[in-house]
Amino acid sequence: MHAGGVCFGFQPRTSLSLRFLRPGVGERLEIAELEETEPPVGRPLREWRPPANPLHARLYRHEARFHLWVEDGGWYTIDPAQPEILVPKGVDPLQREERLWSIPALLCFVQRGDVPLHGAAVEIDGGAVLLCGPSRAGKTTLTAALLGDGHRVLTEDLSCLRPAPSPAVLPGPAMLRVRRDAYQRLKPPGAVVGRDHDRIHLMLDGELRGDGRPVPLRAVLLLRSSDHVQSERVPPQDALRDLWALSLKLPLEEDRSRCFHGLVQLTDAVPIWNLHRPLTYGHLPAVVAEVARLCSVP
């Protein structure tokens, strides 16, 4: 059965309840519960560890399938060619859905030819602006400030980019996980659906959820720390180097080649900017105004 909405251009077929979908239709994605799995044997294809990443996770590959282990979250089995994602049974449904729309979904939309980047995306006047940077670069706090200013959040941390025929962002899950101190200061709109030791988990509804249609990409902003709010255009060759470091790719030759060609298309077609700003709440209004301005620069 269809779950009644889309995420990253996929329309899930599942009996599970999914709360972060956006209205629309898309490509079929099978999602079901995984009864149990035998842990893969051998070295992981890739591993993520704190503090550079919020969770400890390992990704394995066996023939056409991937197996993702997440600490305190169980196993996910992903078959991108189908596409199909099997999620763990008996775990917290909120955490499970949040993790479903991370690496498992990424593996499926990469198979489709889309490009993943480590960045948030916000819609401003009908166009998307990508906010890129490593963990702890202030992406989520800036995204929360833009949300509070009335701009729709397309995705909070993992962006799905379609490079051709013209670059566009496919909206991800309608959610935002905000640090507790940022939530208290900014009070962004959204229904609180969960809390943990570090974050408030918000679900976006109404106009701030919007639909799942692709949004034309107008600008990519590389977030930098500075004493002043300022920006400058980045030459395509320099932007390619920075975006390569922020791209989410596997240590496989075909995946690296796919990623490189997608980023070349992106840097040739979309303005890339360095956005320098102080990481203070007092400067956020000026930063929000600068983001909106850069989204309108041809």
Predicted regions and their residues:
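Long, basic/Gly/Ser/Thr-rich N-terminal segments
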Residues: M1-G90, V291-P298
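Post-Walker A alpha-helix
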Residues: L142-T143
